[in-house]
Amino acid sequence: MSIQDQVRRELAEFTDAESRVARALLGEYPMAGMETVARLARRAETSGPTILRFVARLGFDNYAAFQDAIRSEIQARLQSPLVRYDSIATKSAEADTTDRVAQALRRNIEIAAQDLRKDIGRITALLTDLDRTVLCLGGRFSGMIAAYLYQYLRELRPGVRLVRDGTAAWADYLLDVREGDILVVFDFRRYQRDVLEFARSAAAQKAVIVLVTDIWYSPIAAISDVVVACPVSIPSAFDSGVTGLAMVELMTAGAVEALGPRSKARIATLEALRKPFNLSP
C-alpha cells in the first residue's frame, strides 16, 4: 500500500491537526512529502512536532524514513519499460511465462475489485444519473480503456462523451462542462501532463472526478472525488491494462443493474436502428 493510499484510508482516524497534515500531503503528493518538516508544517498550518507525530502514526521511526519511502514510490512511478527489461531478464528461463503472467493478472484483478467495492455504489449512482453528462478520458495507452467504458455507457444512457481528437481540441470538450458533470479519467504511471491539466480544468468547473489509476496514484488523485487503484505490475517489461479493463466491466455491470428497463429499452432502439446497416441477417 502506498503512503498516499494509507493516508486516505486512515483519514477519519486522525486528530484535527493530523488531518490538516494529511490534506496538505494529499493535495500536493508526493512533492509535499519531500519538503522539510518546517515547510510541511507551514503548508499544513500546524507545528513541527505534529508532523513528526503524523509520520510516527503512519508507522515510520522518523521523518527521514518517511521520505525514503516516498522516494521509493517516486522511483517505482517513473520506471520505464526499458528499466523493467532488466528485472524480467533475471527470471528463470524454466518458469512458464503463461502461468506467471496469468497468476499476476488474477491477483491484480482481485485486489482492484476489493478496492472498488467500497466505492462501487457511489460510482454506479454517478454513472446512472441521467441529469449528468459523463466524459471519458485516458492517456496514450489508457485511452483505449476510456474508449471501452464510453462504448458501453453510450448504449446504456444518453449524454456520454469520449475526449479524443488530440489535445488541441480538448478545450472544446471543457466548454460545456457543468457543475456536477462527471469525468471518468484513466491515468497510469508515467502520467501525462495533458491528462492532468484537463482533469484540473474539469474540477475547476466543479465536475465530479472519478479516477482509475495504479497503486502509486496519478497526481490527479489530489483533485479526485473517487479513486480506484489498480495493480498493474506483471512479469513483463510493460504494465498491464487488464485490471483497468476489468474495472470498466464491473462499473458497467453496476450501471446495467441500476438502469434496468431504461437501458434495455435504449439498447432495443439502438439494435433496431442498426439493422439497415448490418450485412448479416
What annotation goes with each model-predicted range?
Residues 6, 20, 24, 53, ...:
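Alpha-helical scaffold segments in soluble metabolic enzymes
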